[in-house]
């Protein structure tokens, strides 16, 4: 969906997922985060099983905005995933946990724990 009216009409059908296209909404001058917030609040209030799938997320700022607004999940630009996996903190965290594992369990791996 790309407009608030589409979003609320679609929600009336109680779909499994509703996909507000965040980037397109914002490009049309709509506050995409507010639409997601209204959808999430309505779903909660009506106790619906519908999940908000924020679609076409282009950067980490948008990702944080849609999750803060109440999105249950999101579709991401592959470039965003690649960038996130190349953050310097990730290899550091992997080394930290790898070192902690080896200190506690030696060279045994999770696949050895059957």
Please identify what each model-predicted range represents.
Residues 15-28, 70-90:
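Glycine-rich phosphate-binding active-site loops on the catalytic face of alpha/beta enzymes
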Residues 1-2, 22-25, 53-62, 79-81:
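Active-site beta-loop-alpha junctions enriched in small/polar residues
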Residues 75-114:
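Flexible C-terminal active-site loop/helix
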């Amino acid at each position: 969906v790309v407009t608030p009216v589409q979003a609320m009409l679609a929600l009336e059908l109680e779909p499994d997922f509703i996909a507000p296209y965040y980037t397109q909404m914002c490009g049309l001058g709509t506050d995409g985060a507010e639409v997601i917030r209204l959808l999430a609040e309505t779903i909660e209030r009506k106790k619906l099983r519908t999940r908000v799938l924020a679609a076409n997320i282009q950067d980490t700022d948008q990702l944080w905005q849609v999750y803060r607004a109440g999105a249950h999940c999101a579709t991401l630009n592959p470039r965003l995933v690649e960038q996130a996996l190349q953050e310097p903190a990730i290899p550091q965290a992997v080394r930290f946990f790898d070192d902690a594992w080896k200190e506690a369990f030696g060279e045994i791996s999770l696949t050895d724990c059957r």
